[in-house]
């Protein structure tokens, strides 16, 4: 079941973020649980954020977190993904999570652009790119990171 996240989901969302973080290019950046908990709660409560979960058999197996912000060159807004992850058990829920995000962004007043990325290196990036393209996204470039020690 895909549903809007609630405060009771924070621990489950944190578990997925920690799992995904261990696979990401940023895995050497220490994850701070207190900061993560606070930020997930803010996202759940904020009208400018979008948080939905995929729940299977009482467990959170996928999550999509997005946000809107004003474009730096316009009075219009952009919606972008902050975190998108589905466990092996939740495979297949990703498209539904993404559809909900896109629908939310399109219904959000002032949003003129939806930006999606595959910047963390988590999971099958090519599969995620294909999902984005099926949803109507157009590839516009690449992202590079300079890891710091």
Regions found by a protein language model. Name each.
Residues 1-15:
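A short beta-loop-alpha structural element at the N-terminal edge
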Residues 41-53:
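A short helix-loop-beta-strand connector motif used in the catalytic cores of GNAT acetyltransferases and
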Residues 53, 59-69:
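Conserved beta-strand in the GNAT
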Residues 70-81, 140:
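A conserved beta-turn-beta hairpin within the catalytic core of GNAT-like acetyltransferases
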Residues 96-113:
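Conserved acyl-CoA
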Residues 114-128, 147-148:
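Conserved beta-strand-loop-alpha-helix junction that forms the acyl-donor binding cleft
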């Amino acid at each position: 079941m895909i549903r809007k996240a609630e405060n009771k989901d924070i621990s489950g969302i944190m578990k997925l973020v920690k799992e995904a973080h261990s696979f990401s290019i940023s895995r050497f950046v220490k994850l701070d649980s207190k900061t993560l908990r606070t930020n997930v709660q803010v996202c759940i409560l904020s009208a400018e954020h979008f948080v939905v979960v995929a729940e299977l058999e009482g467990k959170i197996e996928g999550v999509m977190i997005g946000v809107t912000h004003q474009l730096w060159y316009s009075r219009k807004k952009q919606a972008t993904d902050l975190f998108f992850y589905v466990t092996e058990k939740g495979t297949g829920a990703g498209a539904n999570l993404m559809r909900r995000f896109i629908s939310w962004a399109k219904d959000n007043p002032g949003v003129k652009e939806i930006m999606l990325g595959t910047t963390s290196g988590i999971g099958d990036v090519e599969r995620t790119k294909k999902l984005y393209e099926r949803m109507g996204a157009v590839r516009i470039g690449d992202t590079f990171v300079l890891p710091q020690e």
